[in-house]
């Protein structure tokens, strides 16, 4: 994560965990160390729609796959049939995020990728009589992580789509489920089996050598009273099962994975509530002012971001954020992306300033087909809104 982590007293218990520059160096095949700068923070992008397709991000690609009009991967596979869907998704996996994309990320000063995946990547967990997901994704995940490791990128793998869906009516779960069916023991068990399997793959396959963090579920329901079983049962068992898998492989404790959960600020309760040991824990916060009820003015957005203190649990990475603003104003003249680049440059800098008070940030997302750089890091760089020298942001002095 950061080279100075061991020096931070609040995080001293994490000093022997598997983090870049603490106990293990990350270098590219040509010897480049992306964590060797004086900053050393996580600076990354999400690979949205690579292995868990969200149609709103890339409608053209979705339509080209034959999935147009379908709400989720589950729906598309149901519509196309398994064999045809497998071919369509394989073509997508091989072209959406490429080795050239990863090289471009590195050239922009990024050092981390977060890779959303679904539990169905472990295919024997899928109920063949009632669940419909694409098959064959593991090979493409291996290739991607191998390229990223060669490039010197740190990798977080995130269980983005949980069994039964951790939130209703949202394609980021891989299905458009009417209710959140995840919060019951048999679904937890399927997720735990996925985590064990993923942990074993990470430690036994050299292509996964730069994977240092495994997130146990993305964006659970934001109602602590409804997800008590997740905190009391799933989180403790995730720790136990991941550690048991590592111990069975005789993994040195310095090479253990960080186990990541959404932090308390997310709204699903305190993730540490039932944990007896948080020695290797990490936390994720998602900060979208678009939906945060902040007064809709440019000054308010800048001041809110500059004053953000996202430290309810430590170490926290702000694992999703963007430059998008409320739907009601996003195309108004005062907020339109093409005519307000100066504001978006400053707001980007303000958010980076806040999130680097913690362990760093991961923008949502790397690429999109929206014609709107506020959701696409790649497009924002091309538009001149995000600099290729991220250290130059300090010179803007947006937050004083």
Curated annotation (Swiss-Prot):
EC numbers for this chain: 3.2.1.75
Primary site of residence: secreted
GO annotation terms (biological process): cell wall organization; glucan catabolic process
Active-site residues (renumbered): 219 (proton donor), 320 (nucleophile)
Location within or outside the cell: Secreted
Annotated catalysed reactions: Random hydrolysis of (1->6)-linkages in (1->6)-beta-D-glucans
Glycosylation sites noted in the Swiss-Prot or TrEMBL record: 30, 272
Keywords: Carbohydrate metabolism, Cell wall biogenesis/degradation, Glycoprotein, Glycosidase, Hydrolase, Polysaccharide degradation, Secreted, Signal
GO cellular component: cell surface; extracellular region
Broadest EC class assigned to this enzyme: hydrolase
Positions of disulphide bridges: none
Record's signal peptide: 1-17
Molecular functions (GO terms): glucan endo-1,6-beta-glucosidase activity; glucan exo-1,3-beta-glucosidase activity
Protein's UniProt keywords contain Lyase: no
Family: Belongs to the glycosyl hydrolase 5 (cellulase A) family.
Function of the molecule: Beta-glucanases participate in the metabolism of beta-glucan, the main structural component of the cell wall. Acts on lutean, pustulan and 1,6-oligo-beta-D-glucosides.
Protein's name in the database: Probable glucan endo-1,6-beta-glucosidase B
Lineage of source species: Eukaryota, Fungi, Dikarya, Ascomycota, Pezizomycotina
